[in-house]
Amino acid sequence: MRLAVGALLVCAVLGLCLAVPDKTVRWCAVSEHEATKCQSFRDHMKSVIPSDGPSVACVKKASYLDCIRAIAANEADAVTLDAGLVYDAYLAPNNLKPVVAEFYGSKEDPQTFYYAVAVVKKDSGFQMNQLRGKKSCHTGLGRSAGWNIPIGLLYCDLPEPRKPLEKAVANFFSGSCAPCADGTDFPQLCQLCPGCGCSTLNQYFGYSGAFKCLKDGAGDVAFVKHSTIFENLANKADRDQYELLCLDNTRKPVDEYKDCHLAQVPSHTVVARSMGGKEDLIWELLNQAQEHFGKDKSKEFQLFSSPHGKDLLFKDSAHGFLKVPPRMDAKMYLGYEYVTAIRNLREGTCPEAPTDECKPVKWCALSHHERLKCDEWSVNSVGKIECVSAETTEDCIAKIMNGEADAMSLDGGFVYIAGKCGLVPVLAENYNKSDNCEDTPEAGYFAIAVVKKSASDLTWDNLKGKKSCHTAVGRTAGWNIPMGLLYNKINHCRFDEFFSEGCAPGSKKDSSLCKLCMGSGLNLCEPNNKEGYYGYTGAFRCLVEKGDVAFVKHQTVPQNTGGKNPDPWAKNLNEKDYELLCLDGTRKPVEEYANCHLARAPNHAVVTRKDKEACVHKILRQQQHLFGSNVTDCSGNFCLFRSETKDLLFRDDTVCLAKLHDRNTYEKYLGEEYVKAVGNLRKCSTSSLLEACTFRRP
């Protein structure tokens, strides 16, 4: 008896015996009407969800900020917020993250974001950096697309003092219509719409009103959302009389808003704690809720309806929910432009404008060796280059997206991911010596499959069950091209079953494609130089020491044989001991790569954000003139294209960084065939970053 009581006490204290996981989502409501709807939500979910399923509890607070604090303190679990409040929720000490997004439109084409744009008449002739002295049309004071975003981005161009903000804006434009502004204190903000009425009684109020202000000729520019012009002008010929102002001081047609906008603004979003936030449970609850009580599902209770108010718990105009990818934090979800605009307004900080003197370029380095080289570059550049570290290439891309870093050079596979994340190529590594290297369009390189000559029975057609060596998951020659070709043959993504073993850095640690890797401890199979079989040289070493086939570039074998690589594993290797697999089932000597390869691949390219494009281009061209291939003695001087190990920051065989001319988007740079091939392989992608970026830019 005493033992039994003791056991029960242990169970009670530790909570370990037959523990039932807490499947309750505590929803935060900010008014009596919201609390009433929350209780109805709770009761109706009980009637349709099994007893072991998710349930709702309601927590009432006085404001959204109180809800944010309650969730951070684990007194509540979820609340739906607009974009501005998502920014507040993300800031320390709250540290909340978006977990579920409302969508609008159809299930087939769900809209989770809108674009804030600056619309002008086609014949007006000015650019974004020439708005001073123009007449402006705004949806309303304090509204996202019509005020916060454009004024936030223009903040540093406003005349000082910038407080009060309304006065600075009034002095920047020659006249405005900013509904809801104080016309007595700031008459210039009401010059185009006398009275500045804060309702539809003011003909220039709201999205359609701001566009009408432009259309009528009262203003020169209207700050609205991307759909406004389509909602007000059904005829394409009429829409063609208008253009969008882009942040890089160019213009684009109104239907190119995805590539020419002030910011991408997310829809209303459910937020939760970043750690222990029940995000999967919240999604399970809301997914089941929309199945039972979504649009046109039930007359008893409707998630997206507010009989006793407007937009209670969720927006009445929402059509459903989408799960936010787990890789996406609030900064990525809101986007660099939006975060910059809001931070400028709240903190009075200024972004780097394209017309400013270029600030240092923050280069993203992977691994200890890359950081050492980057630091040496930084010292030699006399402050033109600064260094930022990240564990993986995808982490670097994310840092560039959110402004923590500015640039890095990427393999074509990662140029694709970076492009999907909104980054742009700015210069290409060129590996061919010529009299005018910087102006010579790069020709690309060949992706090849290398085997040992002694394995004479091995061909492209009988690779199943063999041991494979890859540069890294997601890279061009080592993964995208060979796996894309294999996918077309086997019609599934289980490459870890196709090969018996392999080393494909970036694979899941328990995958057979990590079994051949040589990294120790946590560095095993990591997609950086801490894994000895990472990259071109690493994949070839994997073949030399353990594998049957290596997927690399055509220069890899000659660069690591004949004594060119002095490392102990490579110094005695002979190029003649290796052969290439051809797609027709034959084999050829290594030097015949032009007639025996898997595909031609795009050269590595430097990527950056659109707002840094001009500065990165300018500074890198200066840097290569100082430290490029014209430096002959690298023993006593810093050389940009030489490495203590292999291919640090840039490929070691880079001759120069070449201009892209008109190939300044990832699609144009990579080419239609490569983009299509990588797109087909996306269904096999394990890239959490690609998933997140595709959510933002479908």
UniProtKB/Swiss-Prot annotation:
One of its GO terms (molecular function) is transmembrane transporter binding. Residues 1-19 form the signal peptide. Hydrogencarbonate 2 binds at T471, R475, A477, G478. The keyword Iron applies. Fe(3+) 1 binds at D82, Y114, Y207, H268. Hydrogencarbonate 1 binds at T139, R143, A145, G146. It is found in: Secreted. CDD domains: PBP2_transferrin_C, PBP2_transferrin_N. Residues 25-347, 361-683 form the Transferrin-like domain. Gene3D superfamilies: Periplasmic binding protein-like II. Changing H319R: In allele TF*CHI. GO terms for cellular component: apical plasma membrane; basal part of cell; basal plasma membrane; blood microparticle; cell surface; clathrin-coated endocytic vesicle membrane; clathrin-coated pit; cytoplasmic vesicle. Transferrins are iron binding transport proteins which can bind two Fe(3+) ions in association with the binding of an anion, usually bicarbonate. It is responsible for the transport of iron from sites of absorption and heme degradation to those of storage and utilization. Serum transferrin may also have a further role in stimulating cell proliferation. This is Serotransferrin. The gene is TF.
